[in-house]
Amino acid sequence: MRSAAAAPRSPAVATESRRFAAARWPGWRSLQRPARRSGRGGGGAAPGPYPSAAPPPPGPGPPPSRQSSPPSASDCFGSNGNGGGAFRPGSRRLLGLGGPPRPFVVLLLPLASPGAPPAAPTRASPLGARASPPRSGVSLARPAPGCPRPACEPVYGPLTMSLKPQQQQQQQQQQQQQQQQQQQQQQQPPPAAANVRKPGGSGLLASPAAAPSPSSSSVSSSSATAPSSVVAATSGGGRPGLGRGRNSNKGLPQSTISFDGIYANMRMVHILTSVVGSKCEVQVKNGGIYEGVFKTYSPKCDLVLDAAHEKSTESSSGPKREEIMESILFKCSDFVVVQFKDMDSSYAKRDAFTDSAISAKVNGEHKEKDLEPWDAGELTANEELEALENDVSNGWDPNDMFRYNEENYGVVSTYDSSLSSYTVPLERDNSEEFLKREARANQLAEEIESSAQYKARVALENDDRSEEEKYTAVQRNSSEREGHSINTRENKYIPPGQRNREVISWGSGRQNSPRMGQPGSGSMPSRSTSHTSDFNPNSGSDQRVVNGGVPWPSPCPSPSSRPPSRYQSGPNSLPPRAATPTRPPSRPPSRPSRPPSHPSAHGSPAPVSTMPKRMSSEGPPRMSPKAQRHPRNHRVSAGRGSISSGLEFVSHNPPSEAATPPVARTSPSGGTWSSVVSGVPRLSPKTHRPRSPRQNSIGNTPSGPVLASPQAGIIPTEAVAMPIPAASPTPASPASNRAVTPSSEAKDSRLQDQRQNSPAGNKENIKPNETSPSFSKAENKGISPVVSEHRKQIDDLKKFKNDFRLQPSSTSESMDQLLNKNREGEKSRDLIKDKIEPSAKDSFIENSSSNCTSGSSKPNSPSISPSILSNTEHKRGPEVTSQGVQTSSPACKQEKDDKEEKKDAAEQVRKSTLNPNAKEFNPRSFSQPKPSTTPTSPRPQAQPSPSMVGHQQPTPVYTQPVCFAPNMMYPVPVSPGVQPLYPIPMTPMPVNQAKTYRAVPNMPQQRQDQHHQSAMMHPASAAGPPIAATPPAYSTQYVAYSPQQFPNQPLVQHVPHYQSQHPHVYSPVIQGNARMMAPPTHAQPGLVSSSATQYGAHEQTHAMYACPKLPYNKETSPSFYFAISTGSLAQQYAHPNATLHPHTPHPQPSATPTGQQQSQHGGSHPAPSPVQHHQHQAAQALHLASPQQQSAIYHAGLAPTPPSMTPASNTQSPQNSFPAAQQTVFTIHPSHVQPAYTNPPHMAHVPQAHVQSGMVPSHPTAHAPMMLMTTQPPGGPQAALAQSALQPIPVSTTAHFPYMTHPSVQAHHQQQL
C-alpha cells in the first residue's frame, strides 16, 4: 500500500536526523554483528562505509543517468549489489511495485532481488519522509542474532522504508573497524553509486531533508523502477559509530564483527533496532501487504516478521488463526516498502535513563492497568465466599494433604518433625573422629545456648507479653493510693514536675520502699493521707514532707528515717517512736536499715502520727520530711544517730522534734522519717486540720498548721496524749537523753514545750496561726494528738529506753525527761499559750515545760537535756515548730508556758486525729519513742541538741547524708531545734562526728564551732540542730548543720525548742523536700521544715538553715523557730534567694527560697502565711544567724550549693538550689556552721536562704510561714527578718529573731524554727 502521506523531505526532518547523528550511540558498535547473508547480486550486501554521520546535504545529487529523485534505499544503505543503482522502470521484485517511488504509510521493506538490472540510477523515494527515532517500547521481538537494537527516540508517525534496486554494488569499505566502538570508515562509493549518493555521503538513513520526496511524514519508495531495493530507514545522515540500542544485549556480539550492508549504517541500525517488536507492514512487489511484528533484519536488509499474516483490505476484522504464520522472512529484493506505524519519536528523550525511571514503567507505559470489576457470575458466590471466610482451617486439612500426597505422588507424609523425607539422617558411628565432632558440636551448642544473646532472644521469643504490656502499660498496685503501704508509691505515676523531688528525696514512693523500712509505711500514710499534701501545698506539701520526708528519704533517708534507727532496734521497731530521734543516735549505723524498718514503722499512720505530733509541737517536723529530719536526727543525734547518720544531726534539733523527724527520715529515706514524723500529724485530724492553712505557710504537712500538725500528727503515733514529745524525745535521743541528765532532759523538754508554746506552737496548734506563725499550724495538729497520746508515748519512750540502747545514756533519761517535760511542758505551754494563744496551748505548754527544763539543765548536763528535749520535742515537735520562736524565753519561763499550754495541748490532742495515727506509727517506732509522750513538742528551747544530738546523732546525720550522698553535698543544717536540743557533747559530737556525715566533711567543725558558740547559747541550741542536713526533700542529702554553733549559749532551751519546732518545721520542710536542717542551735531547720511543709513537696528538704546564735531570747527563739514556718520563711526571706527557690511546683524548694529571701530581706518578703509572726521572729532569727551563719551555712562548707540556690547569699543559695528537685541540701559543714553559728549573721543567712528556698513555695511571700530558722541575736538583721517573715511569730520577740549575732539567741531560734 502506498501512502500519499509521504512527502518531500523537509528541513525539519533533516534536523531531526542531524540530531540523531549528534546523539551518538556509542553502544551500538558493540552490537554490530557480522553480516549473516552474503550480499545479493554481485557481492554480498556489503555495507558501504557510510561516510558521514552528518546529515546528508539538503538535496541529493542527481544520479548521472537520470533525473534527481528522492534518495533511494541504495543512497541510504549503499548499493545492494544490483548494479550501479540505475533504476529500471519496469523491473519489479516480489510482485514488484512498478512506477515511480511513492511514499508508503506503511514502511515496507521490499526484498530486492539480487541481480535485478538497475534501472536508471534514479533515486527511490526516500525512506520515510521523517526519520522515526528509535522506539524502545517496541523492542518486544527478538532481533535476529545479527541484528542489534540500538535505542533511539521513536517518532510517532509512519516510518517508511523504500527499497531501490541498484545495479552497482556498493564497494565495501576495506577499512572497517572491527572494534566495538563502531567506527566506520567511509567506503568508497561504487562507480554508479557515486553518482547516486549524496555528496555528503548518505548515512544509514538518507537524511530526510536530503530527499526531495513529496511527503515529509512518510516516504514509500517504489521498487518498481529499481531492480533491487535496499531498506532505507527514515532519518538521514548516517553516522559511523553504532549507537547503544535498547536491546543491545540481544544477539551475539563478537569482537570480530564486520559491519556489512545496512549494519554499517549507524542510523539505519539505530532506527531498525528501535522498532523491533513494533507492528510492521511490509508491501511486497506483487502488491500484497503483510502485517506482523517486526522481529529482526539482516545486514542485507532481509526482514523477519513474527505472527505475520497477509492484510486484507476487505475485512476490518482481525486475522483468522489459520492465517497467522509464526514468522516470515522477507528478502530485501522482495519487498518494496516497510512501514512502522505509530512510532513515538520522543520516547528516547522523554524520560531520564535512570534505573528508577526505566523500571517505573512497563515497557515504556506509565499508566497503570485498568482494573475491571469482578463478577462472580450467577453461582452462589456470596455463600461460597462467606464459607471461605468462616473456614479457619487455613487451607488444606493436614490429613487431606497427606492423603493427596500419597494418592498422587506416592509420598507418605507424617507429622514427624525430623523431616526424614527431606533430609538424610546422620549416620552415627563409634569412630573417634565422629565422637570428637559430636562432642565439639555439643560444646558449641551449649556455648550458644548459654550465651546471654541466645537467652535474651529465647526470652523474647517466649515472652507472651504484648508490646503494650512491656513498654507502654502503666501498672499500679491497688494500694498505691494508700499512703501507708511500703510500696504505695512504687508504681505510682509521678508527674514529671514532681519526679525530681521524689527521686532525690526517695520521696513519696521511695520512702515507702524497703529502703526506708518504716518510712514507706509511715511516710506513705502521711503521704496518702495527705495525698492532698502532695498536690496541695497545704496538705500535700507538709504531709509529704513530714510524712514522707518522702523527698528526703530517697537521698537522705537516713536522717529522716533515722528516728527508727535511733531506736536501737531496727528502724522498723523504731517507727512507732520513729519520730523520736532518741534511739537514732544509738542507731546511726542502722541508718541503712532505718529506711526499711523505719519506713514501715513510720509507714503506719499511727507511728507517723506520733512522730508528726511531736514534730508538730516541735516544729522541726516540718523540716523532718526533708531538712528537719536531718536536724532532728542531729538533735536526736543521740537517739537519732543511727537513723540519720547524717541527718541525725538535723534531727538533733529538739529531742522531740529531732527524734520525730529522724524517725520519719530514717524510715523512709532520710526524709522519710521526718516525713513520717510530720506526716503522722498529717494523718491525724489535727494534722489535716492545721495542714490546710499551715501547710502552705509552714510547709509542714497537710496545712498551715501542718507544721505543728504534721509533727503533732506524727507524734500522735507516739502517744495520743503527747505523741510528739514521746516519739521525738525518746526516739530522737534515747541514748542522748540517757547521757544527758534527767534535769537536762527535762530542760530540753521544757525548751521544746516553750518553743511549741511560742508563736510557732500557736501556729501549729491553731489554724489561724497559719496567718501568724508558720509553726503554729504544725503544733495545732500535733498538740491534740500529743495530749491524747502523751502518756502513752511516755510509756512507750520508757519502754524504748529500756528496750533499746542506741543512745545508752539518753533513752532512760529521755523517758524521765519526757515525763518531766510533760509537766514542764504543761507549765511552759501555759505560759507560752498565754503568749501564743493559738493552738499551741497544749502542745506548747508541754514543750515549754520541756524546753525550760531542758534549757535549764541543758547547760549543766547537755546529755540529759537533749534527751528531754528530744522526747518533748518529738512529742511537741509540731508545737515546738510553731512556738520555736517563742521559746526564746528562759527555760523555766518556757517550762511554765509549756505546762500551761500542755493542758491546751491535751485538749487539742483529744480533738486531734493525729493520736490514732501516732499510735500506728508507734508500733512502727520503737516503744521507747513513746516516752516522747512528754508533750513538750512545742519545746522551742534549744533542747534538741541534748537528746537528738547525742554523739551518735551527728554520725547518723552524716551517715544519712551519705545515704543522701548526692544531696548531702549540701549538708543542710538540720532543724536547729533538733540540734540545739542540747549543747550536749552529743550535739557537738555530731558536728565533730562530721566524719560520720560524709556529705558534710566540714560539719564537725561547724558543729564544734557552733557548739562553742553554743556556750553562749543554750546547750540545746549549741548541740541542737547545728547540723543542717536539709537536702531538697527529694534529695536525701541532709546538710548536717553543726548545732555546735552555740554549744555554750544558754540557747539550750531554745535549741530544744527548736528541736521541738524543728520536727514540726522540719517535718514539713522535709515533707516539702526542702530541709533546712540547722543542727546549729537554731530553729533554722524549722525554717527548712517550714518550706517543706509549705510545699508539701519532699524537695523542700533543701530548706535548710543554719541558726546563727540566736540572741537567745527564749521567747524570741521560739518565735524565730516559728519564723521558719513556710509562710514565715517566705515572708522572712525577702531575700532574692527566696526567689532562688521559686519552684512553685516544688513547694518545698519554693518555700525554702522564699523563706530565705524573707529571712535575709527581713521585712522585704511579706509573710504570706499565718505564721507571719513566727516568720517575723524567724526572720529575725535568720537575720541574726545571717551575719554569722549565712555564709557558714551556705558556706564554702556548703560548697556544693544547691543549684537552685543562688550564691547571692550563701544560705539562700544552697537552699534555693534544693528547693525543687535538687537533692543537694545546704551542707553546712561544722566548720561552716561553726562560723555560721559563731557569727549569727552567717547562720541567719543560711537559715534564711535555706529556709526561704526550701520553706517558701515558688512564691516566697505567698507561702505559709516557712521554717525559717534564723538564729539571730535580738540585735542583728533580725528585725527586718522578723518583721517580714518572722513577725507572725510574736512569741519569740523580734529581738530574738534578728540575725543572731550571738550564738545563744541563734541556737534558740533554731530551736524555735
Curated annotation (Swiss-Prot):
* Feature: compositional bias, Low complexity: 1-12, 104-114, 141-154, 166-187, 204-234, 563-581, 666-681, 847-871, 925-936, 1155-1192
What are the alphabetically sorted keywords of the record? Amyotrophic lateral sclerosis, Cytoplasm, Isopeptide bond, Methylation, Neurodegeneration, Parkinsonism, Phosphoprotein, Spinocerebellar ataxia, Ubl conjugation
Q: Which organism is the protein's source?
A: Homo sapiens
Instruction: Please list the residues that carry the modification Phosphoserine.
Output: 248, 393, 466, 478, 508, 554, 624, 642, 684, 728, 772, 784, 856-857, 861, 865, 867, 888-889
Family listed: Belongs to the ataxin-2 family.
Biased composition range(s): Basic and acidic residues? 459-471, 478-492, 788-804, 821-844, 893-910
Supply one GO CC term from the record.
Golgi apparatus
Segments of skewed composition (Gly residues): 235-244
Protein name stated in the entry: Ataxin-2
Show the GO MF annotations: epidermal growth factor receptor binding; mRNA binding; RNA binding
Q: Which body tissues produce this protein? A: Expressed in the brain, heart, liver, skeletal muscle, pancreas and placenta. Isoform 1 is predominant in the brain and spinal cord. Isoform 4 is more abundant in the cerebellum. In the brain, broadly expressed in the amygdala, caudate nucleus, corpus callosum, hippocampus, hypothalamus, substantia nigra, subthalamic nucleus and thalamus.
- State the encoding gene: ATXN2
Q: Name one GO biological process term.
A: P-body assembly
Output the SMART domains linked to this UniProt entry.
LsmAD
Spell out the residue ranges making up region: Disordered. Answer: 1-255, 459-954, 1137-1219
| Keyword Cytoplasm attributed | yes
Q: Where is the Sm domain?
A: 267-344
> Where are the Omega-N-methylarginine residues found in this chain?
R640
Localization per record: Cytoplasm
Quaternary form?
Monomer. Can also form homodimers. Interacts with TARDBP; the interaction is RNA-dependent. Interacts with RBFOX1. Interacts with polyribosomes. Interacts with SH3GL2 and SH3GL3. Interacts with SH3KBP1 and CBL. Interacts with EGFR. Interacts with ATXN2L.
